C-alpha cells in the first residue's frame, strides 16, 4: 500500500520528510511517493543511498505555508504538495496522505479532495495518549472547535471504530470529557451529547474528568476541538517540564547523580513512552480516505512512525466501518427524538 508524503510541509522540509520516508520504506517495506519539488527531492534522496527502495517522486510546484489561510490556500494553490498528496489518494495511486505542514490546510485538503464520509458533518483529528494501562485515543484535538451534540456523537463513533480496527481494542470504552463525573455536571453541549451517547450501541461509560485520561480505563475520550487542543498542548508541556524538573533535581547532588546510574534504563523507557514521535501522527477522521497530520516540528522518527500508522489506518478500512456504525446507531434520528422531548418539556 503506497503512502503519499507531503515532502514540502513541516518546519524542516524536505530534509526530515525525505529521511523519515526512506526510514519507513527501509524498515517497514512501505512504498512511498514523495510529493514536492522534484529537483530538491531528487537531491535529498541521493544522500540516502536509496537504490532498491520503492520510492518515487510526484512533482508539486507550490507549497502551502504555515501562515497561509487553509481554505484559501487549498483553492488557490491547486498544485500544492499537500493537495496533490490527497489527489493521489483520490486517484487510487496512494492509500494515504501524510503531512507535517499546515494542519488546517491538511484537513481542508482532505475534505476538499476526498470529501466527508456520508453521515459525518465535521471531521475530527485524533491523538493517541500514553496511559498507565496502554494507550487512549482522544478526539477532537483541534479539527472542529465549535461543536454541536451530534458532532461529538459522530466523533465518538469514529473514535470507537479507529480504536477497534487500528488500535486492536476488542470493545472500546468511550467516555465524554467533562468537569465532573456526575450527570448534573457539564455544560449544555456535554449534557445533550451525554443523552445522545447513552442511546447508542457504544460501550459508553459516561462523563470522565481530565485526570482520568492517563489512567487508561477509558479507550476513547471525546471532546470538542477547542478543549481537546488545550488537553494536547498541556500534556505535551507537562511531559517536557516534568523531564526538565527531574533533571534539575538529579544534578543538584552527587548522591542523586549516582542513584541515576542505577535507574537510567527506566528513565530512558519513560522518555520513550511520553515521546510524541513514538506515536507518529494524528489521524484525520471523517473523510473518504486516509489522512495523517504530523507536528510541524516532527523528527525523522515521527515521520517514519506516521507513515507506518497511515498504512495501518488504510489497511483496516476505517471509513467503511464508520459508515456501518453510523447506520447501526441512527445518530440523526436520535438527535431529532431528543429535540422533540426537550420541546415537550419546555
Swiss-Prot record:
GO CC terms: cytoplasm
E.C. number: 2.3.1.274
GO terms for MF: phosphate:acyl-[acyl carrier protein] acyltransferase activity
Reaction catalysis annotation: a fatty acyl-[ACP] + phosphate = an acyl phosphate + holo-[ACP]
Protein localization: Cytoplasm
Listed Pfam families: FA_synthesis
Chief localisation class: cytoplasm
Keyword annotations from UniProtKB, A to Z: Cytoplasm, Lipid biosynthesis, Lipid metabolism, Phospholipid biosynthesis, Phospholipid metabolism, Transferase
Listed pathway(s): Lipid metabolism; phospholipid metabolism
Enzymatic class: transferase
Biological process according to GO: fatty acid biosynthetic process; phospholipid biosynthetic process
Quaternary structure note: Homodimer. Probably interacts with PlsY.
PANTHER family membership: FATTY ACID/PHOSPHOLIPID SYNTHESIS PROTEIN PLSX, PHOSPHATE ACYLTRANSFERASE
Protein role: Catalyzes the reversible formation of acyl-phosphate (acyl-PO(4)) from acyl-[acyl-carrier-protein] (acyl-ACP). This enzyme utilizes acyl-ACP as fatty acyl donor, but not acyl-CoA.
Family from the record: Belongs to the PlsX family.
Protein's UniProt name: Phosphate acyltransferase
Upper taxonomic lineage: Bacteria, Pseudomonadati, Thermodesulfobacteriota, Desulfuromonadia, Desulfuromonadales
